[in-house]
Amino acid sequence: VQRHIANEALQAIDERVSPLVFAGPVGTGKSCLAMLVARLFPRAITWSTPGVLGAICRARTSDSGQVEIPGPDGSSWWSESQFYARFESAPLAVLDDLGTRDLTEAQSDVLLELLNRRHGRGLIVTTNHNRNSLAESVGERIASRLLAGRQWWFDGADLRTRKAVR
């Protein structure tokens, strides 16, 4: 099943469908598949959504204006404009674990900006929310943008705990 989803996702990226949303319960392989797809793209970027949103919000209120995010070049301090330049230029971006925490208004603004900056470019977003709970978690405007692309629902038992029981 995941190979089929990966192939469909690659085709959607090739057709410039964006964003691609992998949704489903905890442990069903969404993040794993997103990372595997990202490995097929040199210079793809993958970040935790809560981490990125928090870092950018902190940068906007810090004296230095720097964002502390591990960068692919080994640097961990980027200005907000450097982060956005890298985010926009990547062939594929993955935002993992959207909606694991409630968003502040500032984080919602940053998320909206991230989605707008990747419009028409490869973007995979993973979330535990379904279509209905997504809008409750991130708001109607952001949910509308997320659902404008393509979605896949991952179903089944938590693969991590199932492996641990064996």
What are these regions (language model features)?
Residues 42-89:
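Short glycine-rich substrate-engagement loop in P-loop NTPases that contacts/grips substrate
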Residues 11, 39, 85-88, 116:
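Surface-exposed alpha-helical segments enriched in charged/polar residues
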Residues 17-21, 43-44, 92, 122-124:
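Residue-level preference for the first positions of well-ordered beta-strands
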Residues 17-34:
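Walker A/P-loop nucleotide-binding motif
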Residues 8, 27, 78-82, 109-113, ...:
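A generic local structural motif
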Residues 1-13:
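N-terminal pre-Walker A segment at the start of P-loop NTPase domains
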Residues 3, 74-78, 105, 109:
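Conserved phosphate-coordination/catalytic loops
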